């Protein structure tokens, strides 16, 4: 008579199934986080050869709207002068003078930004032109233009943040030293907050034609904007916004499909290049990161 082990009656298969079930449940809870991290690692590996060129591309796209605006004014000089003189009431030769100043500041400032020369003066001149044109063309009260200009200014803030080096300046004895790194941090925070104004403008503009696809895109956009503002997985969600905005820009603002004689062609072209500037700001954010005031940086500390 053979003896039976007291453990032989334990249903091993049930224990294995139960263990596998518990293990599977544990894995499912981490699936999204693990997949997101894996996707980001793969994306960084894929983009590694292009990373050195990202800052240059970002700066060029940020100022693309200024290049386009300057070229448009030059190629349409008689029409622009006539509009400013007859409709905006710029008399006594001030109309061509105003346009000339805008063209020079936009071309010189944009070129300096692209090549990282005299950044403070270049960004200051572009900010001045942005405000000057808003008043001159009577767009200061336009809600849509306000959101767009804020987004473009956000991109310029990110470029400005890159000009501050890590050093401390003590101008007055007995007072705390001023950290250039802190200035850079504040500009990075302001830049990424202002960048999302573009999406707020789009959401406010699209009040009709509700569909499930549009609702899903809006939810994804709002979520990504919130993550960029607080700085949680900011690079990943900024890349998501780049994808959404790029696709929407080529679909909505396809000025090349509008006849040349149509008056709407210039409006579509202006919107297209201004949206490209915001895409450039987001690309710059993808490259530089959210900065010190962000959840991502706090996680590194704690």
UniProtKB/Swiss-Prot annotation:
Subcellular localization(s) per the UniProt record: Endoplasmic reticulum membrane
Pfam families: SURF4
Transmembrane residue ranges: 95-115, 120-140, 193-213, 215-235, 236-256, 271-291
Keyword Endoplasmic reticulum listed: yes
GO BP annotation list: endoplasmic reticulum to Golgi vesicle-mediated transport; Golgi organization
Keyword Endoplasmic reticulum: yes
Major place of residence: endoplasmic reticulum
Protein name: Surfeit locus protein 4 homolog
UniProt organism field: Schizosaccharomyces pombe (strain 972 / ATCC 24843) (Fission yeast)
């Amino acid at each position: 008579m053979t003896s039976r082990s007291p453990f032989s009656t334990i249903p091993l298969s049930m224990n294995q199934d139960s263990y596998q079930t518990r293990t599977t449940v544990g894995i499912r809870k981490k699936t999204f986080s693990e997949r997101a991290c894996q996707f980001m690692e793969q994306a960084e590996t894929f983009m590694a050869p292009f990373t050195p060129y990202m800052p240059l591309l970002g700066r060029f796209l940020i100022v693309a709207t200024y290049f386009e605006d300057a070229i448009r004014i030059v190629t349409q000089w008689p029409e622009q002068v006539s509009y400013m003189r007859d409709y905006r009431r710029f008399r006594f030769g001030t109309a061509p003078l105003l346009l000339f100043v805008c063209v020079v500041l936009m071309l010189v400032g944009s070129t300096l930004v692209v090549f990282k020369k005299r950044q403070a003066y270049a960004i200051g001149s572009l900010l001045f032109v942005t405000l000057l044109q808003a008043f001159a063309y009577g767009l200061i009260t336009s809600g849509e233009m306000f959101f767009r200009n804020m987004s473009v200014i956000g991109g310029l803030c990110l470029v400005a943040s890159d000009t501050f080096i890590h050093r401390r300046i003590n101008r007055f004895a007995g007072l705390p030293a001023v950290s250039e790194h802190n200035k850079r941090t504040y500009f990075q925070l302001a830049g990424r907050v202002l960048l999302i104004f573009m999406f707020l403008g789009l959401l406010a503009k699209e009040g009709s034609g509700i569909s499930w696809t549009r609702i899903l895109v809006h939810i994804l956009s709002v979520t990504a904007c919130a993550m960029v503002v607080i700085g949680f997985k900011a690079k990943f969600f900024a890349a998501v916004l780049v994808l959404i905005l790029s696709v929407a820009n080529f679909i909505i603002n396809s000025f090349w499909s509008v006849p040349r004689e149509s008056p709407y062609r210039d409006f579509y072209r202006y919107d297209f290049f201004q949206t490209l500037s915001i895409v450039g700001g987001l690309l710059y954010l993808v490259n530089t990161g959210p900065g010190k005031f962000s959840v991502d940086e706090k996680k590194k500390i704690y």
